[in-house]
Swiss-Prot record:
Reactions it catalyzes: a quinone + NADH + 5 H(+)(in) = a quinol + NAD(+) + 4 H(+)(out)
Residues that hold [4Fe-4S] cluster 1 according to the record: C63, C66, C69, C112
Record GO biological process: aerobic respiration
Presence of the UniProt keyword 4Fe-4S in the record: yes
SUPFAM superfamilies in UniProt: 4Fe-4S ferredoxins (SSF54862)
Function statement: NDH-1 shuttles electrons from NADH, via FMN and iron-sulfur (Fe-S) centers, to quinones in the respiratory chain. The immediate electron acceptor for the enzyme in this species is believed to be ubiquinone. Couples the redox reaction to proton translocation (for every two electrons transferred, four hydrogen ions are translocated across the cytoplasmic membrane), and thus conserves the redox energy in a proton gradient.
Cofactor dependence: [4Fe-4S] cluster
Name recorded for this polypeptide: NADH-quinone oxidoreductase subunit I
InterPro entries in the record: 4Fe4S_Fe-S-bd (IPR017896), 4Fe4S_Fe_S_CS (IPR017900), NADH_quinone_OxRdtase_chainI (IPR010226)
GO cellular component, one term: plasma membrane
Length: 162
């Protein structure tokens, strides 16, 4: 009995008919395609994109050179050098992130006691050379200045879960 059914299905091209029915069913539904450069998709509030160093409202950088982010980075993408200041506190003289090594795990952001290093909302940072993906302190501070309103809002919303 099953061989007869199998033969009838192969003669009537049942697979082709069922495939075409599925195609026509989806053809009549609304489109879900996003026209990317002109339309942007939804980003999660916890999206981890390009890194940034934040500043306090008075313009002073937040990083206290504790080097916790450097120690916790599983990819060893962060390099920090620090010097003591005249008031006894420490500040970074060099803060580099090799974005070619970074795995965007967010451990650096979690380890930072003063929310100095954060991962911002930008995911469009393609480069033509490897050197463009070696971020220094100036580049990271510029990123932080550019996205500070978005970063502060995101951190306030996420504060209950930290």
């Amino acid at each position: 009995m099953t061989s007869i059914v199998r033969t009838l299905r192969s003669l009537t091209l049942w697979e082709l008919v069922s495939g075409m029915a599925l195609t026509f069913r989806y053809m009549l539904k609304p489109k879900v395609t996003i026209n990317y450069p002109f339309e942007k998709g939804y980003l999660s509030p916890r999206f981890r994109g390009e890194h940034a160093l934040r500043r306090y409202a008075n313009g002073e950088e937040r990083c206290i050179a504790c080097k916790l982010c450097e120690a916790i980075c599983p990819a060893q993408a962060i390099t920090i050098e620090a010097e003591p200041r005249t008031d006894g506190s420490r500040r970074t003289t060099r803060y580099d992130i090799d974005m070619t090594k970074c795995i965007y795990c967010g451990f650096c952001e979690e380890a930072c006691p003063v929310d100095a290093i954060v991962e911002g909302p930008n995911f469009e940072f393609a480069a033509e050379t490897r050197e463009e993906l070696l971020y220094n302190k100036a580049k990271l501070l510029a990123n932080g200045d550019r996205w500070e309103p978005e970063l502060a809002l995101r951190l306030r919303k996420d504060a209950a879960y930290r």
